[in-house]
Amino acid sequence: KKSLYYAVLAKAGLPDAMETISKGFDSGSAVDKDNAFYALLNIKGMAAADKLAEIAAADDAAYAAKALDVYVQRIAASDKTPENKTLLLSDVLDIAGSNKALSAADARKIETKALQGLENNKTFQGMMLAGKYLGNADADVSQAAVMAVIRTALAHKEFYGPAVTELLKKAVELNKDKDSNYQREEVQKHLASLPATGGFVSMFNGKDLTGWKGLVENPIARAKMKPAELAKKQAAADETMRKDWVVNNGLMEYVGHGFD
């Protein structure tokens, strides 16, 4: 039976297992599809991660939520660096927030788990990403974001500056944890211990590309240019930059095709 065949392939971890199981999911009968899917869920490590992410982002409600949930589990259990896990969890949040095949309840549950993952990894990028979910309409999502911001900041004294202070103050106000009073005191002491100036200053306002400019050749070449030539090339570079970069859901997204 193919159900047993897929299960054996998944357990054995053979090099061609993913290709065979993926083919069964993509083009097999309804029964084959189900069997292949459950085999994918049982492949340990990150071997099936890309396929699970693909299924999670697709419009098949029968599989999307479970695929995304297991994908989050695989990220958490992997040996990837905290920075790489943060990037993958960012993709999870994008899928959870945009895939209409997910029910609202499933999307919120997965967002909560992804934010908890950001808390566990405690990266600067993860803290800033979690900040976008502070005050979310779903209480669990908002609280997960609160804890990700607070615990990441408290673990890293090198994370400071106006943007970090603003996030921490907002997180403290929204905190519904049973230990919120104690955590408020921790945050206040933490903020008082940080340098009053310097630190992280956001180069991106989260709305548009104001202040961003395209790159004109290299510093040596620019230094040799006359003002009129530099201005002309800068205008062309700025136009290219605006074509290559867009703002999507508060994040800068590259849509270009690389350098010529």
Model-derived regions, located:
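Alpha-solenoid HEAT/Armadillo-like helical repeat scaffolds in large eukaryotic proteins
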Residues: 20-28, 51-59, 91-102, 129-137, ...
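Short regulatory "switch" loops immediately downstream of catalytic or recognition motifs
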Residues: 73-78, 92-100, 154, 173, ...
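Structural detector for internal amphipathic alpha-helices that build alpha-solenoid repeat scaffolds
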Residues: 2-15, 20-23, 33-45, 54, ...
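Hydrophobic beta-strand residues in large extracellular and virion-surface proteins
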Residues: 21, 36, 52, 114, ...
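Charge-dense, low-complexity polyampholytic segments
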Residues: 158-173, 226
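Carbohydrate-interacting regions of secretory-pathway proteins
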Residues: 173, 182-260
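Core helices of alpha-solenoid repeat scaffolds
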Residues: 18, 49, 85-89, 127, ...
